């Protein structure tokens, strides 16, 4: 595949774990980063493979300096979603000294997958983070599962994820969802940090696959606030087993929310369908 270029917005338009949608406000200057060294030897459903890539700066040199720290806004988030929003892969590969990433992957099924490389460079200036995109097609008969309507409760490996009330969400506005997670025994789940956060709220829009990503972090953890334009948002843990998820989406439509957390040592992914006006 040829390297895909991305206009990275520098005028404080999309920051934090930003969106891939067309910006809603006027922007100023742009800088161009692109994916380079993209190698995927094979892509067969159910069989391990390794994806290699790097991020090239506008100068052509590989980006080697990424943010570090205890929070989630560090390094690179590699997020891969199937086009029907029926499967997601979320990894945090580590950069080598020369800026190369090598990540083992297994695609669960055939299909078309959108790859999001959400990068946090350790650079001076207003650029907080940016996203680069690719598409991978895994050969075979691809499943197509119509998105189910909103259901307040999803059960994953015996754990119950329940959203309180019926969400009333509006684009480009701060919204919050209350989420309760209980063990199979019915007791509140205990969360431990995974990839720097107690919970990741990953959003993809049906059809266009626009992307946004917010977090819930432990108290006093830095690098947890997501930004869209001038709006900032961060989730919180309100009590054991209870999360207040931040929702900040750039456009209306049907969105799929993937809540990912590590509860009692188990990494869980709970999907919800949301309507945004």
Regions found by a protein language model. Name each.
Residues 1-7:
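Bacterial N-terminal signal peptides that target proteins for export
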Residues 13-16:
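C-terminal motif of bacterial Sec signal peptides marking the signal peptidase cleavage site
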Residues 18-277:
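N-terminal soluble domains immediately following signal/targeting peptides that reside
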């Amino acid at each position: 595949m040829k390297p895909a270029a991305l206009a990275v917005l520098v005028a404080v338009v999309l920051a934090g774990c930003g969106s891939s949608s067309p910006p809603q406000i006027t922007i100023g200057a742009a800088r161009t980063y692109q994916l380079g060294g993209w190698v995927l030897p094979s892509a067969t459903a159910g069989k391990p493979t390794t994806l290699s890539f790097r991020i090239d700066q506008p100068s052509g040199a590989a980006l080697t300096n990424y943010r570090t720290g205890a929070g989630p806004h560090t390094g690179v988030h590699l997020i891969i979603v199937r086009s029907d929003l029926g499967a997601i892969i979320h990894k945090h590969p580590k950069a080598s000294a020369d800026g190369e990433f090598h990540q083992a992957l297994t695609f669960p099924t055939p299909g078309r997958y959108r790859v999001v490389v959400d990068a946090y460079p350790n650079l001076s200036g207003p650029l907080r983070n940016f996203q680069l995109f690719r598409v991978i097609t895994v050969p075979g008969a691809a499943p197509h599962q119509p998105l189910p309507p909103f259901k307040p409760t999803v059960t994953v490996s015996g754990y119950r994820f329940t959203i309180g009330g019926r969400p009333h969400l509006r684009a480009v506005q701060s919204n919050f969802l209350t989420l309760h997670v209980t063990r199979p025994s019915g007791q509140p789940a205990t969360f431990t940090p995974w990839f720097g956060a107690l919970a990741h709220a990953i959003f993809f829009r049906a059809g266009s696959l626009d992307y946004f990503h917010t977090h819930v972090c432990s108290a006093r953890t830095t690098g947890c606030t997501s930004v869209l334009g001038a709006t900032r948002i961060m989730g919180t843990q309100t009590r054991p087993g209870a999360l207040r998820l931040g929702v900040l989406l750039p456009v209306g439509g049907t969105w799929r929310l993937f809540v990912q957390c590590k509860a009692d040592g188990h990494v869980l992914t709970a999907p919800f369908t949301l309507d945004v006006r």
